[in-house]
Amino acid sequence: MSPQIRVNKMGWRISTHSERSTNTDLMEGPTPRHSLLSGRYKQSFAYLTLRSRMPGIMQQVIMRVVNDLPMLEEKFGEEVRKDVKQIVDAIERLKMELNRDRQFLQFHGNEPDKAEWNAFLSELPRPKRTFFRACWLHAECYLYRRIFSFFENSRFLHNFDCFDHLKQEDLIISEETMKILAKATRDLPKTFDNFHKLLRINLWCNHFEIQLGAFTFTEEEPQNDINVLAKVADIDRVLLVNDSVLVWNCLMKPGPNGIVDYICDNGGFEFFADMVLLEYMVDNNLATQVRLHVKAIPWYISDLTRPDVEWTINYLVHHEDECLSALGKKWARLISSEKIVIAPVSHFWTGPQPYFVMVESDIELYRVLTNSRLAIFKGDLNYRKLMGDYIWDSAEEFITCLRGFRPTNICAMRTVKCEVVCGLPEGMADTLLRNDHTWMISGSYGVIQYTDSLKCSCAFPGEENNIKSEHWPALVQPRSGRSTGAQTPIG
């Protein structure tokens, strides 16, 4: 099908339909087990993302800069029109390259990480250097990196975040939910039960605002009750692996090092929920300091950057609601006193590499993580990088799938949104598939997984996977899992 072209108000020709690939060697069916996720397989979520979702995202970026042109002209003058036209043209070319499954191109501009990217691209086998034949992680990261490079190499818009309005709107529309969560979490006692509830709210926070809006409170269920909010967070959600006890016990162990590294995912309301959890940890001496690891550039639409952190705190500090304003001021104090800090920016987080190569490709970042008690990796993309975007057997141990990446104790919190998952009881994935064929991409299932940095990669029979039994009648009864360590909370 030929692309549909329209002429916008600036006289520029903009495609409104993606060109179809002329490739004939893409394969029917899902990505096979024991292989990297790839858009080569037409029944994979990777193929759907590359064929439909990414061209749509690029079109949205085009419309953002075109619609912002009057504001940009007011700020920079008429010369910014040239920047905008060049960016639009470059994104249109990138869409064409994607849909025709072209080879990845080297970076030749002002990108501070171009040497690392170009080395990585040069080392890829030639058959794995095109969008649909490459590992999905490589193709997707390359697309987002190329998109920002167009801004980065412009004269006026080198710091322009084409996604910031989406992150800010997500926080603004969640105002009522933020008020409820803020009031319910003031002065919570230091107990495992409260910590566990905050973890679950944090895990499901992308659904939480909608669920809370639809929930009918009884007289016995006040909105500012953390128990009720945790129940709301769990509505229609299933926690497949729950190592919360192990995470708590890790944080409760005595020792001089109480630093927690938090590898962030999204901005907006999710970052608000992150801060509620991290504030609780600092207030109750579960962490002496929390280091936030944010993205160096605009990334995956909603990922958190340093300007997003600053904007969020400033928005809360100046909010008209007294509770939210007080909360913003408290978080600002935690940051100024370095109880919560933004870690030095690393482009490794916006690179295409899985985390098990960090020790070779960014030894300084790896050393930073070794100096903490716990590293918490939040979200689906971080999980994919921990797993190497590889389809493991679903019952394979979490620690095995990390492939030697053990700078410190590790926790992964993630809602399942793609075919990469591990650490499930034997047979659970098959039963889930029979009952819900979308379970791997729906976001309705989640995991909180933990491994100790010194744990060996062997099975420990007879230990129970800590899964809530009431979730299981329609699925499968839980059997022995692979979590290790005491299943009783310390303290």
Q: Can you name each region flagged by the protein language model?
A:
Residues P3-S38, V294-A296, D303-G491:
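C-terminal functional extensions of proteins
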Residues I259-D261, R373-L374:
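Structural motif
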Residues L48, L137, V241, F271-M275, ...:
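Conserved structured core elements
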Residues I259, A287-R291, N409:
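Residues at the starts of beta-strands that form the adenosine-phosphate
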Residues S2-I259, S444, Q449-G491:
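Non-catalytic accessory regions outside enzyme or core folds
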Residues A134-H138, I263-F272, I297-W299, D380-K385:
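Gly/Ser/Thr-rich loops at beta-strand to alpha-helix junctions
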Residues I147, C264-G268, A296, R414-K417:
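Short, flexible loop/turn elements at secondary-structure junctions
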Residues F269-R291:
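Histidine-anchored nucleotide/phosphate-binding helix
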